[in-house]
Amino acid sequence: MITLTHVLGSDIPHHNLTVLRFFNDVLAKCLPVEQVRHFMVAAKETAPFSSFPQLDINTYSDKKALAEAVIARAQADRSARFFWHGQFNVTLWLALLSGKIKPGQVYWHVWGADLYEDAKSLKFRLFYLLRRIAQGRVGHVFATRGDLIHYQQRHPRVPASLLYFPTRMDPALTAINIDKPLAGPMTILVGNSGDTTNRHIEALKAIHQQFGPDVRVIIPMGYPANNEAYIEQVRQAGLALFSQDNLRILTEQIPFDDYLNILRECDLGYFIFNRQQGIGTLCLLTQFGVPFVLSRKNPFWQDLAEQHIPVFFYGDTLDEPMIREAQRQLAGLDKQAIAFFNPNYIEGWKQALALAAGEHP
């Protein structure tokens, strides 16, 4: 049996730990060790990895060191196969483009930012062009329905399969309907992180225009680190629209259970990033019967529609009765059948890893 090496090529602690936890706690119990055990991870902080005894994790101090190790292994053994989980590592894309890594060696699971080209500088525009070419040279691509449609417009000949990120969810909560209070001001969650792709200030202005100053707004901004200047910009913009009592900015990473309690309080989510992003938060809101607003440029709306989940589009007319009706629809939805919920996404991972390991034609 072919041994797969899983590559987490950027130091993104939250996402990387979610993947590692899923492999250690779930997949290691039901799949051959050759498919799930071996990882190469870019990480400065390695202490959390001691919680994953079922995995063999080689760590590298930065993206370049990891890429050099992957390239060396790929060149030394052309039968070696790598499963890339997201890929924000320039050196790896250039290695694939130059032939140092061969297409048949790479199986790639797309993460949100992988396909999108937001930066405007000449340097990034050149990189985007090269990356786009390289992305057409992988052996197989895995992604959400919306991202697959986006990808296959550029690379129709590359084999592709549906696969969802292993969002951390408690399946026991899926069957519980949470009653929303119909009186009092609504609570709205804005964005899924402190990243500028959330367009927080634009979202706050739209919320104020649609619902007035009396709604409560919660903005999670505990990630990324060293983001104080942007957080302060968002705070000042928010205070110009909402009272201090109605504006809550979360500037620290918070425990998972505390985050769930915050999501339960919400009546609406507001996510206007122009790409696939924040699927974990969208899943948790759906689990708790909370509808949300998305940009039409976020292709994940196609996955939501496929699962009959109501969604509002940014820029459309929106009022409180429409939100209450969407909450009613979500309460009546068979959430246990949603493809990207835990445990339903596990079967997709079993199929993906078997395919990457050569167990399927």
From Swiss-Prot:
Highest classification ranks of the organism: Bacteria, Pseudomonadati, Pseudomonadota, Gammaproteobacteria, Enterobacterales
Main subcellular localisation: membrane
Gene Ontology molecular function: 4-acetamido-4,6-dideoxy-D-galactose transferase activity; fucosyltransferase activity
Stated family: Belongs to the glycosyltransferase 56 family.
Name of the top EC class for this enzyme: transferase
UniProt key word GTP-binding: no
EC number, UniProt record: 2.4.1.325
BP GO terms, sorted: enterobacterial common antigen biosynthetic process; fucosylation
Entry protein name: TDP-N-acetylfucosamine:lipid II N-acetylfucosaminyltransferase
GO cellular component, one term: plasma membrane
NCBIfam families, A to Z: PRK02797.1-2
Reactions it catalyzes: beta-D-ManNAcA-(1->4)-alpha-D-GlcNAc-di-trans,octa-cis-undecaprenyl diphosphate + dTDP-4-acetamido-4,6-dideoxy-alpha-D-galactose = alpha-D-FucNAc4-(1->4)-beta-D-ManNAcA-(1->4)-D-GlcNAc-undecaprenyl diphosphate + dTDP + H(+)
Role summary: Catalyzes the synthesis of Und-PP-GlcNAc-ManNAcA-Fuc4NAc (Lipid III), the third lipid-linked intermediate involved in ECA synthesis.
InterPro entries: WecF
Compartments (UniProt record): Cell inner membrane
Pathway membership, UniProt: Bacterial outer membrane biogenesis; enterobacterial common antigen biosynthesis
Membrane topology: Peripheral membrane protein
Keywords carried by this UniProt record: Cell inner membrane, Cell membrane, Glycosyltransferase, Membrane, Transferase
